[in-house]
Amino acid sequence: MLDILLFVHITIAILLIIVILMQRSGSDGISSISGGGNMGVISAKTANNFLTKSTVILASLFLINAIILANLSSQKKPDLVSKINEIEENQVDNSLPIAK
């Protein structure tokens, strides 16, 4: 479960970076690479509105997923040292003679 959420978290982060870089800025951002500089006013507003909504949705999903990952990873799990100590306590001392 934790691995799946971690994969989803990384995927959301990559998508969020791409969407943020595609948004228009003073120099048109990366969207000008695909010929976005010649768009009409209506299509430019539509694309900008879509990218803004996508950014908000992806950022919200990123935040929610980060909180879930933090909660899952903070749950108490027995660590390796306690498992080793438990095994050592349960072992029989082999140096003692055994009566037959």
From Swiss-Prot:
Keywords: Cell membrane, Membrane, Protein transport, Translocation, Transmembrane, Transmembrane helix, Transport
Signal peptide positions (record): none
GO cellular component, one term: plasma membrane
Molecular function GO labels: protein-transporting ATPase activity
Major subcellular site: membrane
Transmembrane stretches, start-end: 1-21, 54-74
One of the GO BP terms on file: intracellular protein transmembrane transport
A Pfam family that the UniProt record links to this protein: SecG
Record bears the keyword Repeat: no
Protein topology in the membrane: Multi-pass membrane protein
Protein localization: Cell membrane
Keyword Amino-acid biosynthesis: no
Family (UniProt): Belongs to the SecG family.
Protein task: Involved in protein export. Participates in an early event of protein translocation.
Name of the featured protein: Protein-export membrane protein SecG
